[in-house]
Amino acid sequence: MYETNHTSERLKLLFKILIPVLIYQLANFSAQFIDTVMTGQYHEMHLAGVSIAGSLYNPFFTLLNGIVAALIPIVGQLLGKNDKNGIQKIVFQFMYIGILLAIILFCIGLIGLNPALNQMHLEAEVSTIAREYLLLLSIGFIPFLLFSVIRSFIDALGLTRVSMFLMILLVPLNMFFNYSLIYGKFGLPELGGPGAGLGTAMAYWVLLIVAIIVLKKHPKLKPYHVLSFERPHLLLWKEPFALGLPIGFNVFGEVAIFALVGLLMAKFGSQVIASHQAAMNFSYLAYAFPMSISNALTIIVSYEIGQKNQKSAKEYIRLGISTSVIIAFLTLVWLYFNRPMISGLYGTSESFIQLTMVFLSYSLLFQMFDAIAAPIQGILRGYKDAKMPFILCLLGFWVIGLPVGIMLDWMTDLGPYAYWIALIAGLMSNCFLLMLRLRSVQKKYDERGLVYGK
């Protein structure tokens, strides 16, 4: 990270951080994309099982990953103050937190998985596939969260190219392990859909080992000594949880509504489940663009606030949101004209492709609102503002969006489409509320004179 004084310099730095973030976000989303595509090509019933499993674990993964992501603004502001010792201490504490969260997630799954699946009244084979997938995936909980800590630390330093190369490595690892275990290649058992869970877990173990080597060898990471042993200091856990829990529950609230919609699709049959998952899965890939801009703005804004430069932070915010809207428009135009090709990636039957195309059409609307809402969430995290965005997320998705879907399902013949309309309503509301919150936060900084432009 470095100071900038002109718009051209800021745009250059924004893209210097953004492009690697975008590439590794695409690589990150590709893990579930690979699971979905490979499983769908194996058998439609296995795709339905993996889809249900994803609806169950995605909210918890994003909740815990959101808590860990609080490391980015914390380190970003410490970096702005040039506090290397503080950075080393807080990163190691986050590693303890990551392990603790992984153990908690495993225990929740152990206790609640069977009751949750039994309540859904799924076809027996779909339920079995979902259960086995999640049990095998749980082997990767600890490396997933520890890697998330390391990646967040690297990102906060502005070294997003390093994170990019690490995440790119995930793609061939995941493809190799998935292919081997789904189809039973290279002497390994043919596990079908559950093999994708084990393949992803194994890929993250390898990725964690590589990330630790990078921490020890990279010349810009070695000076921070983040792997130097530190005992747990519970007093240092206050800020990570004070900031991380609202961030985590904010993301959880958003992902949970999407997951709940996925679960509600169960009553419409396995083909609707599979088509819904296919459309949603590709939407997640498209979401990598605004999410990447969100992460880049968290890194930059937190650094500028640490430097006490509100004027520069505002300029980055303007550039970031404008970039997100332009990229989203171009992406959605391409998506609209390529719906048949995209649908064909996930399945082969004509009825499946036609239904998936309809779901993809609905996704175009909520992705446009995401292009504004996601960057604003990242900006607010850079300001260390997390509690109010969490409340606004609950209001937009659960108080406005979900009731709309339930009412439309009950009062009309829209069927599964009612819940896609609910997602659109929730994201539109969330977008508007977050815009108001950002304006309020910036106004407080300006009025109180807490941060001055240089």
Label every PLM stretch briefly:
Residues N65-V68, L137-D155, S163-V171, A196-I212, ...:
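Short runs within selected transmembrane alpha-helices of multi-pass transporters and secretion channels
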